[in-house]
C-alpha cells in the first residue's frame, strides 16, 4: 500500500522546492458535484497528484473538490488530461492559472476530506446549492460596474478586501465566509430590486453565496466566473480595462497577485502606503498583518515591540513563555480589532 500522506519535514520539503530548477505553475480549481466516497476519491487523487509531483492544498467532501496547487510546467498538460479523465464531472473543468507567479507557492501536498469544501455554516435542508446566480464574463463585469442599478458584493475576508477590490464594491465585514453569508442577506434586504454581483478570489465562495442569496429571495443575482483571477486574465487577453484595484490576496506563500499599480492599503504600524502581508516572526504570534519595509526592519518582521522583544529571547525561553501563556494563539489585531487564531497563512475556505 503506498504512503498516502507526507512524512518529510516542512523545512526539508521547502528547501527541496526552492532548489528546483524547473518552473512551476500555480493553479486553482473547484467543482461542486456529488462525490459518493470522498475518502476513496482522496486516496486515488493523492496517488495521481504525487506521481506528477504536484504540491498544494486540496479539500474533498460529498459536495465536491476545492484545490490550490503547484504543478511542474512540463506536467501541466498531463495533469489536465488525467484530471479530466478521472471523473466525468471534471471533464473540461476550468483551471485558474495564477496571474503573478514565481512558482514557489507550495512545497508539500496536503489533501483532506472535510464536511464541506467551503465552511458555510448552512444547515437549512431546503437550501439548493446548485441554484446559483448567472455567470459574468470580463466584458459583462465591466458593463455591470458602469450600471447604476448594480451592486458589487465582495465575498472575501477583510484582509483580502483591504489590499484590493473592484471599484465601489461593498465589503461584508466579517472574518470568515460563514459569518458573511447571513450578513450579506441582512445588508442587502433594502436592495432586493438591485442587480447583485458577487465575487471572490477564484469563484468558489461567490458561487455558493449567489445560491444563498437566491434562496433568501434575491432574484437578480450574478457572480463572476472564475473570480478575480479569471476576470483579470480574460480582461488582459481581450484588451479590456481591468477594473479591479490593487492586489488580489492569495492563500499560498505569495500572499498576493499584483492586478493594478495602485496601492490602496496601509502599513498597520506606521500608516505608509503598503499592501504586503506578512506573518509576525514571533513564533508565539504569527499574526497576519501589513508591514512596510521600514517597519519590517524596525520591528525585525514582528507586529509589535513586545513580539520583537520576545522573538529575540533564547528559543528555550520563548517555548517556556508560550507554554505558560493562556490562549497564546489568540493575538489581537490592532488594525481591525479582531482575534487571529490562525498560525501562518489563513484557510480560504473558512
From Swiss-Prot:
Q: What InterPro entries does its record include?
A: Rhodanese-like_dom (IPR001763), Rhodanese-like_dom_sf (IPR036873), Rhodanese_C (IPR022111), TrhO (IPR020936), TRHO_N (IPR040503)
| UniProt keyword list | Oxidoreductase, tRNA processing
Q: What is its EC number?
A: 1.14.-.-
What's a BP term from Gene Ontology annotated to this protein? tRNA modification
Q: Which GO terms describe its molecular function?
A: oxidoreductase activity, acting on paired donors, with incorporation or reduction of molecular oxygen
Q: Which residues form the Rhodanese domain?
A: 146-240
Residue numbers annotated as active site: 200
- Cysteines paired by S-S bonds: none
| Pfam families (UniProt xref) | Rhodanese, Rhodanese_C, UPF0176_N
Please give the superkingdom of this protein's source.
Answer: Bacteria
Per its UniProt record, what CDD domains does this chain match? Answer: RHOD_YceA
Q: Which reaction does it catalyse?
A: uridine(34) in tRNA + AH2 + O2 = 5-hydroxyuridine(34) in tRNA + A + H2O
> Which class of enzymes does this protein belong to?
oxidoreductase
Q: Which PANTHER family match?
A: TRNA URIDINE(34) HYDROXYLASE, UPF0176 PROTEIN YCEA
Q: Which family does it belong to?
A: Belongs to the TrhO family.
The entry's function note states: Catalyzes oxygen-dependent 5-hydroxyuridine (ho5U) modification at position 34 in tRNAs, the first step in 5-carboxymethoxyuridine (cmo5U) biosynthesis. May be part of an alternate pathway, which is able to bypass cmo5U biogenesis in a subset of tRNAs under aerobic conditions.
Q: Which HAMAP family match?
A: TrhO
Question: What is the designated name of this protein?
Answer: tRNA uridine(34) hydroxylase
Source species: Escherichia coli O127:H6 (strain E2348/69 / EPEC)
